[in-house]
Amino acid sequence: MRLITLFLILASLPLHAQKAPKTKALIKLTPIEVATEDRVYKRTPQGELKLHFFKPKGGLQIAVQRPCVVFFFGGGWKSGSYLQFVPQAEYLASRGIIAACADYRISSIHKTTPDKAVEDAKSAIRWVRGHADEIGVDPTKIIAAGGSAGGHLAACTALVTAYDAESDDKNISAKPNALVLFNPAMNIATLFRERAAEQNPVKMDVAEAITPNNFVTKDTPPAILFFGTADQLKIGGDEFVQKARALGLRAEMWAAPEMPHGFFNKAPWMQVTARQMDVFLTSLNYLGGEPTIRLPEGAPSLIAE
């Protein structure tokens, strides 16, 4: 019963925290203006998919290869928009990282299933790495990031070896070099197994094949995860961290006391989690100096687990 409730929480996200606004995000994490650019990274039978780039102001200096982060929005693989992670993308661009918010196929618009979204996420990472020289990206410093269903997709780019699009150049790796995951869905096979088969968007063999926790290996990149302690999806996050640490890997878990799923979408937790993301990326030498983000007065603290 607990797992059924968990799935219902995930599936309902388009109506609540994970539904991105249809207008520009109101929260600004930096006063610094950044450059923007849209690039089509994939053409599918259901339409074009874009990467919405946010770059350090003044244009790219191609001689300088910068880290790049690709954000995937949440929405239960049903709905959502790249706009969800615009605040974080703008902030990281202001700090010198090239950031991109990715489109991917969702059921409400494209009538597709989660495995197609996995294909799209891997295609997005491959596009960035394959065009690294053109867009000024260091191909050894690519970060996959996302929230909820988007966190699941980001994790899949690092862990899932199946579900590569036929149009992809398989000689280009889709594996990112680091993960930033906001309450990701890491154990979807367990969730789907507790439901009636006709209620699941994919069959169980597909669910197993796109469950990140099934594929944690010594090659898993360093990861940081954010969860509210009241979020039942945290069970899967804890499982991932346990598996990664057992292999001697770096996997950080930061918990927001008594907070529900999607807590990071609103102030003050958006600022708090973004600052910790900055600290993590600085520790990997993807950023330099101190975080420039200002925390609201009396902002709460995350707990390291």
Model-derived features: positions:
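N-terminal cap/lid segment of alpha/beta-hydrolase-fold proteins
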Residues: 19-64, 217
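C-terminal catalytic histidine-bearing segment of alpha/beta-hydrolase fold enzymes
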Residues: 52, 226, 232, 238-305
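Short beta-strand element of the alpha/beta-hydrolase
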Residues: 63-75
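A fold-wide structural signal in alpha/beta-hydrolase
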Residues: 68, 91-103, 143, 178, ...
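The conserved beta1-alpha1 loop
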Residues: 72-74, 128, 227-228
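Catalytic nucleophile-loop/oxyanion-hole region of alpha/beta-hydrolase
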Residues: 81-82, 88, 102-139, 266-273
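Primarily recognizes the serine-hydrolase "nucleophile elbow" in alpha/beta-hydrolase
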Residues: 83, 123-197, 203, 207-208, ...
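Short beta-strand/loop motif that positions the catalytic acidic residue
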Residues: 219, 224-228
